[in-house]
From Swiss-Prot:
Its EC number(s): 4.2.1.171
GO molecular function: lyase activity
Family (UniProt): Belongs to the AcnX family.
Stated regulation of activity: Inhibited by Zn(2+). Inhibited by pyrrole-2-carboxylate and its derivative 2-thiophenecarboxylate.
Gene expressing this chain: lhpI
Keywords noted in UniProt: Iron, Lyase
Listed name of the protein: Cis-3-hydroxy-L-proline dehydratase
Record's keyword annotation contains Lyase: yes
Species of provenance: Agrobacterium fabrum (strain C58 / ATCC 33970) (Agrobacterium tumefaciens (strain C58))
InterPro entries xrefs: Acnase/IPM_dHydase_lsu_aba_1/3 (IPR015931), AcnX (IPR012047), PMDh-L-like_dom (IPR007506), PMDh-S-like_dom (IPR002840)
Active-site residues annotated for this sequence: S70
Phylogenetic placement of the source organism: Bacteria, Pseudomonadati, Pseudomonadota, Alphaproteobacteria, Hyphomicrobiales
Length: 569
């Protein structure tokens, strides 16, 4: 693109959601997950690894390329809008769905407008350097420069008779509202049609903010029911035991009500962030509608199913109609690798290698689908891939990746424009240090982010080998009820209990709160790259990262291993 601004070129500014706003510019070149990255109670950035850490977004015009990470960011933004703590406008230079959906729901269901604008990269860079920006329906202004804003896209959307009937209210006001939101999102995504989905996975059941409950109960009260069979993500409490665990009523009650609202709408109370472990897991080529970032990435990458990374709230809308915008990775051409990442494979790796590589792969491909090369000889297990996908989702906005020799669609030809980058051993050592900046002394070991599989539970019991944790170090595993039941049948659960391990259903590390999260904890140890990234912001505690064996060592000694792993030394 020329450095000069042309009046004959395609519009440089596109309105995604119209509105008027002004404020100081808050700019970053790094995407941010609003869930786990922004405190809905204050509007401050809490992601300790992000350049904007500590900045309050309230009232500012936020310039960032796109969002990343959690699908729950839409709920956080909706809550910020409803409480008056949101940025005054969002300005992107790449496609973005999660925050856009939150702003769309605010406008559609609560009559609260927050402008969302997309600029070309050059204009984005120029305007992001301004001190103050103002936006109205037709223009964006900064530093004496005024740029016309093109209206929202109005591409033709081919609806079938059933779609149109839902849109005019045949199936009630809740379905009509759901279809209105789907059609609006399809327009901004450039979709020309909708696609049938066979199942959904609901992420909006996590009590990330009061807005999640407000939305769900409003849809339930309007008579909303899911049309596509839909599982539910982990929730924010142990549903049957939260009162006995001492969870305050003012948190436990709305968290439980939120889960109940989705069950009332026909969702299955699976309460797991690892739905790919359920018997209902989809097959290759199956079009589904999942939310929860790690699940979306695993479904596309490992199972070969097809799903966009649907934001919270859109997940329910699609489940209620059985229809999703036909865009993104629902289309085979859009599943091709857009970047090639050559990864160094050291000798003697352990399980910590995989989340570390996932974390770095997301940084290497923050906004596109990568093909990882060099890992096939290591023959990663499904749990290795699970850990990699979850960590990848913290640092990338992409809904999938490919791993040569390990994932089913890795043979898709990369785009002709795909560049090649590398992940070196030096990169791994630097990332290891980044995720291990806490003190050596730990009071908690956190396993199960995402929810642990039966094989992970067995592996943990095997490493403990009958030994018992230190009395002053809690060890907590979060897992889905189906996995816990299976672990109970084969003796694994009893072995873990004998070692002093607590196994909790329903909630996960991304939603756990005090006092279930041990209040005396100052630092914790985890084998999850995802929780190593989000944990400091979510819990306010320092985090150490390592292998499953490192976690058991910490449980036995109260100290994190203070060295690089042998395979990085």
């Amino acid at each position: 693109m020329s450095s000069a601004v042309s009046t004959t070129a395609a519009p440089e500014a596109r309105s995604i959601l119209a509105g008027a706003a002004e404020g100081k510019v808050i700019a970053t070149t790094e995407a941010l997950s609003f869930w786990g990255g922004v405190d809905p109670a204050t509007g401050k950035v809490i992601d300790v690894h992000h350049p904007l850490h500590g900045i309050c977004l309230t009232g500012g015009v936020l310039f960032m390329p796109t969002s990343r990470g959690s699908c729950t960011g839409s709920g956080v933004l909706l809550d910020l809008i409803l409480t008056g703590r949101a940025p005054s406008a969002l300005v992107f230079c790449e496609a973005e769905d999660v925050l856009t959906l939150g702003a769309l729901v605010a406008a559609e269901m609560f009559d609260k407008a927050l402008p969302v604008i997309r600029l070309d990269a050059e204009t984005f860079s120029r305007f992001s350097r301004a001190a103050h920006v103002s936006i109205d329906q037709n223009t964006i202004k900064a530093d004496g420069v005024s740029l016309a804003i093109a209206p929202p896209a109005t591409a033709h959307l081919d609806l079938n008779d059933d779609d149109r009937a839902m849109l005019v209210g045949r199936d009630g006001i809740a379905v009509r509202q759901a279809m209105r939101i789907i059609v609006a999102m399809a327009a901004q995504q450039g979709a020309s049609a909708l696609v049938d989905v066979t199942q959904g996975h609901i992420d909006g059941c996590i009590y990330a903010s009061p807005a999640n409950l407000t939305f769900a109960e409003k849809m339930a009260d309007m008579g909303g029911k899911v049309r596509a069979p839909s599982t539910m993500n982990a929730i924010s409490v142990d549903k049957a035991n939260w009162r006995a665990q001492g969870v305050p009523e003012d948190f436990g009650d709305p968290a439980a009500r939120l889960a109940d609202a989705y069950v009332r709408m026909g969702c299955k109370p699976t309460f797991t962030c690892s739905p790919y472990l359920l018997d209902s897991a989809p097959s290759a080529g199956e079009s589904i509608a999942w939310a929860e970032s790690n699940a979306v990435i695993f479904a596309n990458t490992v199972l070969g199913a097809r799903t966009a990374k649907h934001p919270d709230f859109l997940d329910l809308c699609i489940a209620m109609t059985g229809r999703a915008p036909l865009s993104g990775v629902y289309i085979e051409e859009n599943r091709r690798p857009q970047r090639i990442v050559d990864v160094a494979l050291p000798a003697g790796i352990d399980d910590a290698f995989w989340p570390l590589v996932g974390y770095l792969a997301g940084k290497a491909a923050p906004d596109c689908i990568p093909l990882l090369r060099g890992l096939g000889a290591a023959k990663p297990s499904r749990d290795d891939l699970k850990a990699l996908c979850a960590a990848f989702g913290t640092t990338s906005a992409s809904p999938m990746l490919h791993i040569e020799g390990a994932t089913p669609e890795a043979g898709l030809a990369p785009l002709e424009t795909a560049e090649t980058v590398t992940i070196s051993l030096q990169d791994m050592a630097a990332a290891w240090s980044l995720l291990n900046d806490g003190p050596e002394e730990v009071q908690l070991v956190a396993i199960g982010s995402p929810h642990a599989s039966l094989e992970e539970c067995r592996a943990l019991a095997a490493v403990f080998a009958g030994r018992k944790r230190r009395a002053d170090v809690a060890v907590i595993v979060t897992a889905g009820q189906q996995v816990i039941d299976a672990a109970g049948k084969d003796g694994t659960l009893q072995s873990l209990k004998d070692s002093g391990v607590q196994v909790l259903p329903d909630l996960c590390w991304c939603s756990i709160s005090e006092p279930v999260f041990p209040t005396k904890t100052r630092a914790l140890m985890t084998n999850s790259g995802k929780y190593a990234h989000y944990g400091p912001g979510l819990s306010g505690r320092a985090v150490r990262f390592g292998s499953l064996a490192d976690c058991v060592e910490s449980a036995l000694t109260g100290r994190a291993v203070s060295r690089l792993p042998v395979w990085l030394s």
